[in-house]
Amino acid sequence: VNQSETPVKHIGKVF
C-alpha cells in the first residue's frame, strides 16, 4: 500500500 494514500484508505486496506 502506498503511503501516499490517505490514512483512512491505508487503515481500510492494512488494518
From Swiss-Prot:
Protein name (record): Fibrinolytic enzyme FA-I
Organism, scientific name: Paenarthrobacter aurescens (Arthrobacter aurescens)
